[in-house]
Structures are given as structure tokens and as C-alpha cells.
């Protein structure tokens, strides 16, 4: 679950992390064809990851299952129990499961079905929705238009979301794929609307879990925000011990809500090892991202995670990343700073700044927020001298 960018920046204003781009690339999205790659005896070396990144899982992660029905129905006792479990998970590793989340019956299953429909289209038809460099929305295969090594073994369809009207998800897909594929856009639009509504509820529950006097603080903070929706398709891989569907990373966004199919693949780094998050029928995975870690003043942990692949089965997941309004200052509630500016863990920043950092040649990992914060402080010091 990742907003991709490269491990080191080539953005001109991020001079501490400048690197030299390769002069040429072996592949790009127009020529990465996983159907053909699967027929080859070996996986191309561009898809190999370092040994430390592909270290095997050491077991299953026992995540709390948060039943949202009490919170959604206004039951204060059940809400407080849910908030307590959320707090414990977010302080430990930044992830938990939610059930009884209020989605319309059958919507999640239909969205997964539609994702299979899209990824089952011909390569030429999928490329009609090709992601233009610099844009959020579009289709990619292996992200080879951006990277030359450590490529993810996946195809993705990423769509920018903003609460409408207009219906930006549906409009983008219909404009690219044509009216005869209108159902794809309609279902994904409905699913994104439901995900966004759930995010607002989760933001309030997070505020309660932190003991904020104004329990709606985070809900209101994100009311005018946006989202990024991503469909992931992980084909079978002949050398899963060397490849990854998505490399180890923390999401730079606020919180991430993930729908898995029934194939194992999501792993979280917790208590010093990689641990598997097994799919559970009816449950959604919620991960804390870097932006919310900053909004919590470091009290809640950004979830470090990855996606592994296997030899036999296709795996699908649908992911919704929540983002604040681009120009809104990311600053924790005053009560989390204990009245002392010196206790601030991260400097003020905007989502636009962090997004530019992660989209300008920096591959997100578990040091993104630290590196970004260091650059902000360094740049501020230079301006003041």
C-alpha cells in the first residue's frame, strides 16, 4: 500500500538527497507485460529486492478487531472500548482491523470483482488509462516508468478522489475507457464514497482514542480533504522469495483503509520481525500513515508494511489513502504538545510539501517523515541566516 516515489530524491529543492538518474530504463509501463513475464523461466533481475527486504514472515500478527457498530450507533460504552483497543494498536505498530463498518451489502465484493474486470482487459485497453508522469490517476505495470530496479511485481490503477459532485473517479475512467466501460467507474466511485465516509468516522474514533477534548478534531480537519484510491493486482510469481508486490514502506498519507481478497500477502513489521496480516471476511485493514503520525505528535506509529507475492495465486487489494487539503498546515492539537513548542516532534508542513517530496523521485520507506522533517528544518535555518 504505497504512494510511490524513489528512495532518493531528484527534486531540485531537496539537495541533501540528490542522486543521478539512470540514462536509460530497461522497461516502461507500455512494455511490462506480466502475462509474458510469467511464461519466462526466471523473473527479470529488475524485480529482485535486497535480502533484508524479502526476509520471510515469522508468523501471524494478532491484530485487534474493532467492531464499529457500537460507535456508529452512538453507544458510548462500546465506543470507549473500541477507542482503547485502537490506541493500543496504534501505539504498538499502527494497524488494526475494523468490522461492521457500515458498507452497503455486497459493495466490497462488487468492487473486487470490477477490479478483476479491469485488470483482465487487454494490455492495449488498460493502457488507455495510462498514468501520465506527474499525475496521480492512471494505470501502471511494475512502476518501471519511474524506477530501474527493485520493481514491484504488480499492476496498479490509481485514482484521485475528491468528494463530489463532480464524480472525479467515474469521470476519469469513463473519459479514458469509454462509455461501454462505464460500470467500472460507477462501482469504483461508489466504493470511494463509502471509503471516504468510513475515514471520517475513523478520524473521530482516533480523536476519542487520544483523549482529545474535541473528539471531532480530526474529522473536521479532514472534511475538506481528498483521497487516493488504488487497485492492486499481484500476478503469480515464479520466484516469490526474491520479488515483492510492494516493497517495505510507510504510507506518507494520513490513514489507509485496505480491502484484501482471500489471498495472503500483507505483512507488517512489528516487534522486530515481519508478520502476516491474514485476510478476514468482512474486515478492513486500517493503517496509520506518516501524516497522521505527525498530527498525533508521534504518539501513534506509522505502519511499516509490505506486500509479498506467491507462485500460484493472483492477489487483489483495494486501498484508500486519506489526505488533508493540500494547503492545510499539519500541526497536532495543542493538548498533545503539552504547551511546550520544544515538545513538538515534527515541524509544521503541508500535505502539498510532503506529497511533492514523495512524488519527485523519493521512494517512500520507514525514514520518509524523518528525512522530510530534517530537510524542512535545514531549509528554514538557511533562510533565517
Curated annotation (Swiss-Prot):
Domain Fe2OG dioxygenase: 224-324
Pfam families linked: 2OG-FeII_Oxy (PF03171), DIOX_N (PF14226)
Cofactor mode of binding and number, as noted: Binds 1 Fe(2+) ion per subunit.
Gene: GA20OX5
Stated family: Belongs to the iron/ascorbate-dependent oxidoreductase family. GA20OX subfamily.
UniProt-annotated catalytic positions: 315
UniProt-recorded name of the protein: Gibberellin 20 oxidase 5
UniProt: Fe cation binding residues: 249, 251, 305
Tissue-by-tissue expression: Expressed in 3-day-old seedlings and siliques. Detected in dry seeds, roots, old leaves and inflorescences.
Record field: catalytic activity: gibberellin A12 + 2 2-oxoglutarate + 3 O2 + H(+) = gibberellin A9 + 2 succinate + 3 CO2 + 2 H2O; gibberellin A53 + 2 2-oxoglutarate + 3 O2 + H(+) = gibberellin A20 + 2 succinate + 3 CO2 + 2 H2O
Keywords linked to the UniProt accession: Iron, Metal-binding, Oxidoreductase
Pathway this chain belongs to: Plant hormone biosynthesis; gibberellin biosynthesis
Induction of expression: Not controlled by the level of physiologically active gibberellin.
Entry-linked InterPro entries: DIOX_N (IPR026992), IPNS-like_FE2OG_OXY (IPR044861), IPNS-like_sf (IPR027443), Iron_ascorbate_oxido_reductase (IPR050231), Oxoglu/Fe-dep_dioxygenase_dom (IPR005123)
Gene Ontology molecular function: any one: gibberellin 20-oxidase activity
Protein origin, superkingdom: Eukaryota
Needed co-factor(s): Fe(2+); L-ascorbate
Amino acid at each position: 500500500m504505497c504512494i510511490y516515489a524513489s528512495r532518493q530524491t531528484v527534486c531540485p529543492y531537496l539537495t541533501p538527497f540528490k542522486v543521478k538518474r539512470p540514462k536509460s530504463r530497461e522497461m516502461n509501463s507500455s512494455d511490462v507485460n506480466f502475462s509474458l513475464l510469467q511464461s519466462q523461466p526466471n523473473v527479470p533481475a529488475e524485480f529482485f529486492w535486497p535480502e533484508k527486504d524479502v526476509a520471510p514472515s515469522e508468523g501471524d500478527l494478532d491484530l485487534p478487531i474493532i467492531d464499529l457498530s457500537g460507535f456508529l450507533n452512538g453507544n458510548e460504552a462500546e465506543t470507549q472500548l473500541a477507542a482503547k483497543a485502537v490506541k493500543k494498536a496504534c501505539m504498538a505498530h499502527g494497524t488494526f482491523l475494523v468490522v461492521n463498518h457500515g458498507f452497503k451489502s455486497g459493495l466490497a465484493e462488487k468492487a473486487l470483482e470490477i477490479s478483476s474486470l479491469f485488470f483482465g482487459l487487454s494490455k492495449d485497453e488498460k493502457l488507455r488509462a495510462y498514468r501520465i508522469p506527474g499525475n496521480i490517476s492512471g494505470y501502471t505495470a511494475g512502476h518501471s516508468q519511474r524506477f530501474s530496479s527493485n520493481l514491484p511485481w504488480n499492476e496498479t490503477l490509481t485514482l484521485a478522489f475528491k468528494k463530489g459532485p463532480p464524480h472525479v473517479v467515474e469521470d476519469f475512467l469513463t473519459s479514458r475507457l469509454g462509455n461501454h466501460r462505464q460500470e467500472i467507474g460507477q462501482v469504483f466511485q461508489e466504493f470511494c464514497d463509502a471509503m471516504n465516509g468510513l475515514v471520517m468516522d475513523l478520524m473521530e474514533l482516533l480523536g476519542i482514542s487520544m483523549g482529545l477534548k474535541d473528539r471531532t478534531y480530526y474529522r473536521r480537519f479532514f472534511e475538506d480533504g481528498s483521497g487516493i484510491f488504488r487497485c492492486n493486482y499481484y500476478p503469480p510469481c515464479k520466484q516469490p522469495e526474491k520479488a515483492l508486490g510492494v516493497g517495505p514502506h510507510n504510507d506518507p498519507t494520513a490513514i489507509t483503509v485496505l480491502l484484501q481478497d482471500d489471498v495472503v500477502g500483507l505483512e507488517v513489521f512489528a516487534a522486530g520481525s515481519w508478520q502476516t496480516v491474514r485476510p478476514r471476511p468482512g474486515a478492513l485493514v486500517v493503517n496509520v500513515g506518516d501524516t497522521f503520525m505527525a498530527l498525533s505528535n508521534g504518539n501513534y506509529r506509522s505502519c511499516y508494511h509490505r506486500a509479498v507475492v506467491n507462485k500460484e495465486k493472483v492477489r487483489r487489494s483495494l486501498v484508500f489513502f486519506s489526505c488533508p487539503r493540500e494547503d492545510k498546515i499539519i500541526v497536532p492539537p495543542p493538548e498533545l504538545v503539552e504547551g511546550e513548542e520544544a515538545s513538538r516532534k515534527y515541524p509544521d508542513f503541508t500535505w502539498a510539501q510532503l506529497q511533492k517530496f514523495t512524488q519527485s523521485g523519493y521512494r517512500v520507506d520507514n525514514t520518509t517523515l524523518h528525512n522530510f522533517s530534517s530537510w524542512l528544518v535545514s531549509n528554514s535555518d538557511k533562510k533565517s541566516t
